[in-house]
Amino acid sequence: MDLNKQILSRRPIIIALIAILVVLIGGGGFWVYRLAWAPNFKPDKTVYVYIDDKKDFDDLCRQLRDSANCLRIGSFKQLSGLLKYPASMRTGRYAVKPGMSNLTLLNDLRRGHQVAARVTFNNVRFKEDLAERISDQLMFGKENLLCLLNDSVYCDSLGFTPETIHALFIPNTYEIYWNISADKFIRRMKREYDAFWTPERLKKAEEIGLTPVEASILASIVEEETAASDEYPIVAGLYINRLHAGIPLQADPTVKFAVGDFSLQRILFEHLEIDSPYNTYKHAGLPPGPLRIPTIKGLNSVLNHTKHKYLYMCAKEDFSGRHNFAVTLAEHNRNANRYRAELNRRRIR
């Protein structure tokens, strides 16, 4: 009886202790949930954080605050410490999605589960432009890429020279991991180049009498020559006619390249006298390398050029960017005289 009385007397204390324990467990569970699984990032849309060799954990936290609308940066830091993440940061481009939790993001960061970047390049003329365009989209620096593109031994290992390396790059959109090295990026482009040059395309180039690199060089001239893409196959056919006939190309864009000024509106005799292997008024055949990185459309226009007898072309006097084509020199001279007259009328020197 006394024992029952003792138990009954202590019952409120036991209930209180159990209640406290439940509260503690519940509170601990809520704390763990809030720390690990509760949504902690609420950007308006998926954003990306970037970690390179120079960034530390504090830099990452700043990105999460500024770009990913982190609600509780302290909890992210706390869980990162518990998981020893700051000591094992991996470079890369990581997605932060609306409603993401600390643990989900940290699992991606710790395992290096990054999201590939969509790398695009087009309308690129010089290697310096290419290096800048690509380095703006990937982790490596402009100089890292330029160093390889200008290295004759490296280019030779890929079947190119520093003058022809432009031809390696086929303009398109590629999914590439942001932290790729410059060397691996170039080798990825080499695989894309090899995939582009199918047996069918190789056969077409061979039938014309061109290697893939020579086809790229010619395509670059074609694209610089006309602003009207529907003229590409006609212009390509014209230059192929001249190559087969042993006639110098006499392509104005090659002179502009030799001069180093693509803004020239009028090619003068002094420009034609520049002694450069790119000056196709002085040197027969194709120049040593592409004037720009040709597009797929430009390359295909060479491989599928229009068959005709044109040997001459001159910009139209309406300055539309289109051309008058001619079979004979006499016809060409008439076209050229009309164009020169319009240049004079507009006082373009």
Each model region followed by its residue ranges:
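Pocket-edge positions in alpha/beta enzyme catalytic cores
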Residues: L21, V49-D52, K97, E207, ...
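Polar/charged alpha-helical tracts
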Residues: K5, S9-I15, Y33-L35, R62, ...
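N-terminal type II signal-anchor transmembrane helix
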Residues: D2-T46
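N-terminal start-of-chain detector that recognizes signal peptides
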Residues: A19-L24, D66-A68, T91-R93, N144-L149, ...
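Bacterial extracytoplasmic/cell-wall-associated proteins, especially those involved in peptidoglycan
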Residues: T120, L138-E143, C147, Y154-R349
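Intrinsic structural disorder
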Residues: M1-A16, T46, D53, R62-A68, ...
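Signal peptide-directed extracytoplasmic domains
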Residues: F30-W197
